[in-house]
């Protein structure tokens, strides 16, 4: 018997909801954003740039935002007791991060880079281009921290330095450790589309995957690669996942028990986020590999999950509606892709 989805409860605005209202920038809701590089943004006083929140799936533990740094500009210095993982959706720039002036580290990045801000470190993002803006897609644990402490002084003006999470000097960029299959610890990945992933044969032929602990965060993330003609099984989990397409094309199918399936096309720059316990499956319809970058759950280094019941979290292909597979095969044929479909048990 499958675990039913949880009912929505509303006891009024949470501390995080109130923070979003106070920030005064647009808030995008729903499940899917077509392209983060074209979203309408607003003036963000705290950051000193343009931005919008992506409060997809009404998340209250993790969330995301998009910020745009104009040419020859920079963000205001930021410091906060919540974690951030940054994906560079557009442009080239640099980030300075420090706990004190002696420990300041500056590194450059370009499209497709991912990195984390060490907890409660001060940082500034820079745009060195005189003509092109930068867009950053950022996942955060802000909702959980604000909802627990509901005190902005503690979150944004806390002097404590987490020295165990900060690699000073050259060590910040030198720190790279391939811990085991499909798991890497580092502070910066220059380009998720060119970073070598490990084979994941139990997920499907030619499927590749890598989980990361970035910047010693507890916030989890991973990159998955689906070859042509490849799709995932339908799976579900708790709220908080945000997924951005970094390479290729296809679609995602979303639904909850008792509701109709929704199909959403995706391309590079599309972001989607399933609701709590919402079934979802990823489908590659292109002639090349499809990669996505997902932020959700705990990082491998600090995961405290100890139990999982696959019967509650995945639908074997033999048990799904046959129309799903037939539709996929027909789309592949129209696109000139071999219809020998590989199914990824995700």
Q: Residue ranges of each PLM-predicted region?
A:
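A short, N-terminal "cap"/entry segment at the start of jelly-roll beta-barrel domains
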Residues: 1-60, 151-218, 222, 322-346
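Short histidine-centered beta-strand/loop micro-motifs
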Residues: 53-56, 74-80, 97, 106-107, ...
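Glycine- and acidic-residue-biased ligand/ion/polar-headgroup-sensing regions
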Residues: 70-71, 80-100, 227-228, 237-257
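Histidine-centered metal-chelating micro-motifs
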Residues: 74-76, 94-95, 113-125, 231-232, ...
